[in-house]
């Protein structure tokens, strides 16, 4: 608009130049007319390119576009980026997918990782944890979330898994995203011959109840044996962690979750429940890299655990699994025989 306005003025003045020059020749007004003629013959020329360039050179323009104020200091929003030195493009994509989930939960990258030497959970940072990961051999997985930390801080529980398992987890995640997109578009998944994981019958999960009041001995022996045996068989398990007297095995809905947030427990009870959760995570993380958790520690928690894939290329693992099942059948048969002998002797 400014360009057209200037051009119009210049055209108007162009036809008036002759008259103005005659006016300027007048001796009386010679001094005054020189200023007018200088103004007319030195009008600035409008250059769109120069105008745009000068407009973008403002030192303060968009200065705070990617900043936020913190007191008197400006801080840039930083995004953690890890450069991998190993693995294929797909292996790196799978690891980056898990990394995004971790940072979404804890933006500083603080995690809890399983120490391979002690088999215990220890606090660490994802930057240091990833330095020792060779993606050609192992991938990473977020097996659970530690909600017991003080305040609003949540620590993802991370472990290394075989690269084959990491790639399967990534593939399952992409499939689930695709199915959700199809559902939003109104596509019936049943017609495509596929079914959402959430639509599977509850009977596909083995329900195991765990009490907050369970003793350390029962947790390490009886309950640990029950959990491990099911995972080794390839069964998916759902751990219902609740009070001893509760028999609630129903899913947790939004209303119940809101009610949980309003309840509270003592510090002593909170500490005990944290110990139970930590020991359960130590047990299941060795056999699974797909763990979902819902609920709150002050009421009840449901942990759904999908076992890792059995390496079919390893004959030793298949043989060991067969031997274990054989021993279980023999032990079961022996118990039946002893029970029958006891009943016969009493008669």
Curated annotation (Swiss-Prot):
One of its GO terms (cellular component) is mitochondrion. Keywords: Mitochondrion, Transit peptide. It is found in: Mitochondrion. Residues 50-70 have a biased composition (Basic residues). Its main location: mitochondrion. InterPro entries: AIM23. Residues 47-78, 317-347 are annotated as: Disordered. Belongs to the AIM23 family. This is Altered inheritance of mitochondria protein 23, mitochondrial. It comes from Kluyveromyces lactis (strain ATCC 8585 / CBS 2359 / DSM 70799 / NBRC 1267 / NRRL Y-1140 / WM37).
């Amino acid at each position: 608009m400014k360009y057209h306005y200037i051009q119009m003025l210049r055209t108007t003045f162009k036809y008036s130049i002759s008259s103005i020059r005659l006016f300027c020749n007048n001796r009386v007004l010679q001094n005054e007319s020189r200023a007018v003629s200088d103004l007319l013959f030195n009008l600035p020329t409008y250059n769109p390119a120069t105008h745009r360039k000068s407009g973008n050179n403002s030192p303060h323009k968009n200065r705070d576009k990617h900043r936020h104020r913190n007191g008197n200091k400006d801080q840039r929003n930083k995004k953690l980026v890890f450069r991998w030195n190993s693995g294929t493009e797909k292996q790196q994509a799978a690891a980056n997918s898990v990394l995004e989930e971790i940072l979404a939960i804890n933006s500083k990258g603080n995690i809890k990782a399983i120490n391979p030497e002690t088999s215990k959970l220890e606090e660490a940072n994802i930057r240091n944890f990833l330095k020792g990961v060779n993606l050609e051999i192992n991938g990473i997985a977020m097996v659970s979330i530690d909600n017991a930390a003080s305040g609003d801080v949540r620590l993802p529980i991370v472990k290394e898994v075989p690269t084959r398992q990491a790639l399967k987890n990534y593939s399952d995640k992409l499939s689930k995203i695709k199915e959700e997109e199809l559902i939003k578009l109104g596509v019936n998944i049943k017609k495509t011959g596929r079914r959402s994981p959430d639509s599977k019958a509850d009977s596909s999960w083995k329900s195991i109840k765990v009490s907050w009041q369970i003793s350390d001995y029962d947790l390490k022996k009886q309950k640990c044996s029950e959990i491990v045996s099911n995972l080794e068989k390839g069964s998916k398990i759902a751990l219902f962690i609740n009070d001893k007297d509760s028999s609630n095995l129903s899913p947790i809905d939004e209303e119940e979750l809101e009610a949980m947030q309003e309840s509270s427990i003592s510090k002593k009870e909170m500490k005990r429940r944290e110990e139970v959760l930590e020991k359960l995570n130590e047990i299941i993380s060795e056999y699974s890299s797909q763990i979902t958790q819902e609920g709150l520690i002050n009421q009840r928690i449901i942990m759904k655990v999908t076992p890792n894939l059995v390496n079919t290329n390893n004959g030793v693992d298949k043989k060991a699994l067969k031997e274990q099942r054989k021993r279980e059948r023999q032990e079961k048969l022996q118990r039946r025989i002893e029970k029958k002998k006891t009943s016969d002797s009493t008669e």
